[in-house]
């Protein structure tokens, strides 16, 4: 709908340019937003205020001319001028109802991608191996997964790339520690975190051990068979830990998506050679660097992008450049999204620019750093265990499931007290599992990607507010309508007719699902989908309260309201699935 309104506004602008009202050469970015108060219409634009000055007119006068020039359209009932010159657009109720009937009949709910389909690389999760995933890996994993799901739903070809850290000093530490311990790796490495911490302690305390670790890294990089064999085993064990976390989280990541740093080892020398051939490299204290004039430090000196250390070693930038070239040349990506901590913003700005100057990626390939804030504890400080250690992600998920189980068990006892049929133990365990994992994920996804947030079990497990339990309950509420009806959602007849304010408000929200998903895909911000679903659930609650469904006044009204309920249920379920959340029929 927003695209339609933009096109209508553009046609009006063209007409006003042709008749001399507007000067030639204007190319405004036409903004169309949802109104906050639907009594002021469904959509609004400030285009008249944007162009009033170049037109030499008062905003309201220009708004009047724009309304006069707007072509009629079946989707619009009327356009009004508000305040200093806003254009408020009101959807036609008959057209809106018919569009929802079409959405209900469509397995994709009438959602279409705005623009051509693309091949999109999603760089997500990417933990360092040799130790277990911790809470700091949650955001990249689930935000990247949600955006990937939305892009796929819209028709893009999505290629997930788990750029794990499977090379470097940490493996030298583990190899050196393994030399000192007469143990079997298979037996001892089941708790990789304990083994890693012990190796790190030796590395920090013993200069001799640290030197040995660095020596073993060199041997590993030179292809020493024994080092490679143990390195491979470390990676297998570490990746198996990661996969357990991914499965527990319900994210679409598998071993086939792993493309670690080591995969680009053979390309790094060529990256340096190509940068040299392009005249981009400068030697600085023995290191090979690219200096970009637009990136300077506080003293005004250009900041280096180091691609090879003085000793010959390579850095993250070198590997990232090799990966970008691979993603263009081999994966044929039109767009690459990097879900990495926003503290790496400067790094990505620099390597993106180097990649373009070197010709590793073309000018029209979209490279976007989807930075995110940090997850803190309830006290606002970095999330730690009680003894100050790093919280394993798997431990956090287990605690979430345990807390959710206790919560649903308590609510089950309340069902018994009310004389309702209780859930059995297996059902309670499954509900607790879904509620626990969904709550952790939704609490994160519902925050703006770039914001820091405080992790709080009590808030995220609440059945009130913008939480997973609230939305899961909304889904079960819709499902209960059809259980009472004794009929499936796919068997509905009749058509949608919009009469009551609550019906219109719910319908208007449902009609925006496609625009909303396209916005999430464009900006990489799942919190918009969370906010949409939360508002949809609230509007359904108001509709449910004020518009009797099963006891409607006549069969036509009953059919219409059942169809609205069915479309609401499907939209809630589809939206939650795109966020990577499970749903429940009963809870």
UniProtKB/Swiss-Prot annotation:
It holds the Pfam family DALR_1. One of its GO terms (biological process) is arginyl-tRNA aminoacylation. A motif ('HIGH' region) lies at residues 127-137. Keywords: Aminoacyl-tRNA synthetase, ATP-binding, Cytoplasm, Ligase, Nucleotide-binding, Protein biosynthesis. It catalyses: tRNA(Arg) + L-arginine + ATP = L-arginyl-tRNA(Arg) + AMP + diphosphate. It is found in: Cytoplasm. It is an enzyme of class 6 (ligase). GO terms for molecular function: arginine-tRNA ligase activity; ATP binding. One of its GO terms (cellular component) is cytoplasm. SUPFAM superfamilies: Anticodon-binding domain of a subclass of class I aminoacyl-tRNA synthetases, Arginyl-tRNA synthetase (ArgRS), N-terminal 'additional' domain, Nucleotidylyl transferase. PROSITE patterns: AA_TRNA_LIGASE_I. InterPro entries: aa-tRNA-synth_I_CS, Arg-tRNA-ligase, Arg-tRNA-synth_N, Arg-tRNA-synth_N_sf, ArgRS_core, DALR_anticod-bd, Rossmann-like_a/b/a_fold, tRNAsynth_Ia_anticodon-bd. Its EC number is 6.1.1.19. Monomer. Belongs to the class-I aminoacyl-tRNA synthetase family. This is Arginine--tRNA ligase. It comes from Pseudomonas paraeruginosa (strain DSM 24068 / PA7) (Pseudomonas aeruginosa (strain PA7)).
